Amino acid sequence: MKKILLTNDDGYHAKGIKALEQALEKMAEIYVVAPKHEKSACSQCITITAPLRAEKIKGKEGRHYKIDDGTPSDCVYLAINELFKHVCFDLVISGINLGSNMGEDTIYSGTVAGAIEGTIQGVPSIAISQILSHRNKNTPLSFDLAQKIIQDLVQNIFTNGYPLKGRKLLNVNVPNCSLQEYKGECITPKGYRLYKKEVHKRTDPKNESYFWLGLHPLEWQKRENEDRLSDFDAIASNHVSITPLNLDLTSYDDLKNLESWHKGMLK
């Protein structure tokens, strides 16, 4: 039977990872290693200056752990190299995140980092996020569409193989709409996220300052000379966005220009 490792950055008890396990439990043998507490926006942080403690969850056949103060990267690293080192995983899936991971979000994202760590460890990996924008807070959060999408993707991978070669992963964002409103899937490049320089300064009872960094609305800028819809455009039109991400951050287009610039500096 196929074996899938799940992680997230919202924490072991988050609704998203429970929905993810529920969606896949009949398709594969599921293992879960997730942070004990929320680790949103921790990026690729890995713990090397403190010990990590793994708590085995009772009643889960030894396949569930939560990592005290662990990050998503810690969880995947520890799962593959120690906790389940006897298991050959077919997939690592990180999510379902509560909120988008598009554009530059992918640099900050702990959810994407979990999938990146799986890729680094040589396992095909997917990050999946559920958009929350414009959701009526009086309406219960539904993962129905996200569950359908991940089931379809995983089945396609099991049938036809993982579509990417080398150190690459899939980043999936699911619009906040019903199955009836859903328009289909788009293969997209990342868009350009527009961040506001928002900092909220407060004063505590001891008259000392503290700060909250602002949460930003989903605003983006069109990519130049790009005919494809970006991930933001797809979501805005009730499409699922599927974006291939590459771990290699080298700007190859700039190598020759940089060589010329550097030669000039040495004269």
From Swiss-Prot:
Location, primary (coarse class): cytoplasm
Hydrolase is among the record's keywords: yes
Cofactor note: Binds 1 divalent metal cation per subunit.
This protein's record includes keyword Metal-binding: yes
GO terms under cellular component: cytoplasm
InterPro entries for the chain: SurE, SurE-like_Pase/nucleotidase, SurE-like_sf
EC number: 3.1.3.5
GO molecular function annotation: 3'-nucleotidase activity; 5'-nucleotidase activity; exopolyphosphatase activity; metal ion binding; nucleotide binding
Reactions listed under catalytic activity: a ribonucleoside 5'-phosphate + H2O = a ribonucleoside + phosphate
SUPFAM superfamilies documented for this protein: SurE-like (SSF64167)
Cell compartments where the protein resides: Cytoplasm
Cystine crosslinks: none
Residues engaged in binding a divalent metal cation: D9, D10, S40, N97
Assigned keywords, A-Z: Cytoplasm, Hydrolase, Metal-binding, Nucleotide-binding
Cofactor(s) essential for the protein: a divalent metal cation
Class of this enzyme: hydrolase
Function: Nucleotidase that shows phosphatase activity on nucleoside 5'-monophosphates.
Family: Belongs to the SurE nucleotidase family.
PANTHER family, per the entry: 5'-NUCLEOTIDASE SURE, 5'_3'-NUCLEOTIDASE SURE
The name this protein goes by in its record: 5'-nucleotidase SurE
Organism: Helicobacter pylori (strain Shi470)
Encoding gene per record: surE
